[in-house]
Amino acid sequence: MDVGFFTMPIHPIDKDYKKSLLEDRHAFLLADRLGFSEAYCGEHVTDAAENITSSALFIASIASCTKNIRLGTGTVNMPNSHPAAIAGQIAMLDHMLDGRLNFGISPGGLASDAEVFGNLDKNRNEMFVECIDMVLEIWKRDAPYNIKGKYWNVSTERTQMTEIGQGIMQKPLQKPYPPIICTVVAPFSKGLVAAAARGWQPISANFLLPKWAKTHWPSYVQGCEESGLEVDSKNWRVAKSIFVCEDRNKAKEYALGNGSPYVFYYKQLLTKMLKHGRANLFKEDQNMADSDLKLEDICNKLILYGSADEVADKILEFREEVGDFGTLLYAGHDWADVDLAKKSMELMAEKVMPKINDNIKICLLYTSDAADETGR
């Protein structure tokens, strides 16, 4: 199992903006130094807490400072931009990263972003599909372009000057294009079936209960099989809220106590989900009333904390429940205590992951030996 990083992010709204951006930058650079395989950041234009306004721009700002880690948009909210702008920016970014880009896409989940871009009352899922189809068509064909849709048109036919390069759009370095990644939130996601059928790879959100995260694998398998694509659990990424600290009392206090950035994170999410009728994500029983949801219960279910050994055991228990997956995405939270936050990432890479992978190897050997014995 690989370890990666994913942040929306969510910071206190009274935190200095420059400081929060620098902390997010340092988290990505630390992830690279620690050997994390990949890292993603979200984008939200109208949220003072979720305050990275362009995931592509943020990634571009750290491209030359990273060496090995793959960087991903997490995600580009497709209905909020013109497909030609997205195609050009992502193509350039892939070259800036020398092919280390993962292209994360979604319809966007922040209602105020949809409103500010004039999409609140439109079919954003339909816009999402049209936008990504146009982006891929731009990368597939040569100029001049004349791509027509319901929401956008892309054309350079009237102004094409091929001999001097005018009217020609850039293509990504990776061929035919960077891996396309989609975030998955809904249980039993039909959207994931369609995404998998197109060869896109899923990230299961860290704010999903294990009961619902495990429903994503069958949807992914169904989509792959419908298109005759190879089914590989290495392509499934699962995000989790994790805090590692060798002082167990301190671990619990930072994860669940007063002033915890983890509790703040889930308070923000719960408030939004309740407002927009999506609080079912936090319910084991879908018949449960919204008024019965308790922040404390949600945090206890979704935040993994403790010593390196304890966290490794909890992650293995989680894996046993949801099934095998290729990459565990360590969810980035506000660095309320910079030293504790950094140390947690270090322990995750240096202590937790080796124990997890040693355990997985032993289980695989045991399974292989058992199969050999059965076959004799």
Task: Give the role of each language-model region.
Residues 9-21, 78-83, 178-186, 302-306:
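Active-site mouth loops of central-metabolism enzymes
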Residues 366-371:
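Conserved small/polar residues in nucleotide/adenosyl-binding loops
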Residues 1-15, 110, 164-176, 287-300:
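N-terminal small/glycine-rich loop or linker at the start of catalytic domains
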Residues 306-321:
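A short, acidic, amphipathic alpha-helical segment used as a generic capping/interface helix at domain edges
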Residues 1-71, 177-178:
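N-terminal beta1-alpha1-beta2 module of alpha/beta enzyme domains
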Residues 3, 62, 93, 135, ...:
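Conserved, mostly hydrophobic/aromatic
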Residues 3-5, 39-41, 71-73, 101-105, ...:
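Hydrophobic faces of well-ordered beta-strands that scaffold small-molecule active sites
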Residues 82-198, 214-218, 225-227:
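Internal, glycine-rich beta/alpha segment that forms the wall or movable "lid"
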